[in-house]
């Protein structure tokens, strides 16, 4: 079994829904493609059949990956999360020390739930790794591909 992954209840349920969809509808569609390609005769020179089999292989790998994630998932209850330091599932309010009027907010989540458009960043990202374990008032320097970012932690809370 792989490393533990930490998910919210919503994140866990989304993975279960995706798995169900892949195992029912998507798998059925792929099997229909294989059957259709098989009906065209000689399989040794049947590109359509080869493509359908490759799609099946990728689908089964994706199903296995999601099953492994679900099997190794720990569901975190936001009510149990402490806010004395930055942990997974905490939200942080940061002041950009290079542009004092810029305040940003992130919620630290697992890689599986990261969505930068929603302000959810992975604890494994450069920003997430730099923030984990820090407290209100701490100043952090975050190395990113474009250089360094400098922030002060203004608040830690759970949404």
From Swiss-Prot:
GO terms for biological process: DNA-templated transcription elongation; regulation of DNA-templated transcription elongation. The keyword Metal-binding does not apply. This is Transcription elongation factor GreA. The gene is greA. Gene3D superfamilies: Transcription elongation factor, GreA/GreB, C-terminal domain (3.10.50.30), Transcription elongation factor, GreA/GreB, N-terminal domain (1.10.287.180). Keywords: Coiled coil, DNA-binding, Transcription, Transcription regulation. Disulfide bonds: none annotated. InterPro entries: GreA/GreB_C_sf, TF_GreA/GreB_CS, Tscrpt_elong_fac_GreA, Tscrpt_elong_fac_GreA/B, Tscrpt_elong_fac_GreA/B_C, Tscrpt_elong_fac_GreA/B_fam, Tscrpt_elong_fac_GreA/B_N, Tscrpt_elong_fac_GreA/B_N_sf. The lineage of its organism: Bacteria, Pseudomonadati, Chlorobiota, Chlorobiia, Chlorobiales. Signal peptide: none annotated. One of its GO terms (molecular function) is RNA polymerase binding. Belongs to the GreA/GreB family. SUPFAM superfamilies: FKBP-like, GreA transcript cleavage protein, N-terminal domain. It holds the Pfam family GreA_GreB_N. Residues 43-75 form a coiled coil. It comes from Chlorobaculum tepidum (strain ATCC 49652 / DSM 12025 / NBRC 103806 / TLS) (Chlorobium tepidum). Necessary for efficient RNA polymerase transcription elongation past template-encoded arresting sites. The arresting sites in DNA have the property of trapping a certain fraction of elongating RNA polymerases that pass through, resulting in locked ternary complexes. Cleavage of the nascent transcript by cleavage factors such as GreA or GreB allows the resumption of elongation from the new 3'terminus. GreA releases sequences of 2 to 3 nucleotides. Transmembrane segments: none annotated.
């Amino acid at each position: 079994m792989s490393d533990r992954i930490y998910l919210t209840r919503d994140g866990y349920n989304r993975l279960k829904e995706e798995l169900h969809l892949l195992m029912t509808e998507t798998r059925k569609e792929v099997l229909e493609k294989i059957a259709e390609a098989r009906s065209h005769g000689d399989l040794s020179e049947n590109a359509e059949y080869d493509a359908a089999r490759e799609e099946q292989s990728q689908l089964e790998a994706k199903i296995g990956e999601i099953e492994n994630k679900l099997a190794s998932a720990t569901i975190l209850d936001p009510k149990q999360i402490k806010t004395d330091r930055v942990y997974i599932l905490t939200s942080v309010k940061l002041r950009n020390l290079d542009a004092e009027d810029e305040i940003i907010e992130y919620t630290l989540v697992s890689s599986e739930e990261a969505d930068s458009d929603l302000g959810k960043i992975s604890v494994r990202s450069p920003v997430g790794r730099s923030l984990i374990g820090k407290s209100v008032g701490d100043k952090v320097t975050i190395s990113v591909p474009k250089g360094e970012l400098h922030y002060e932690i203004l608040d830690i809370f759970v949404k």
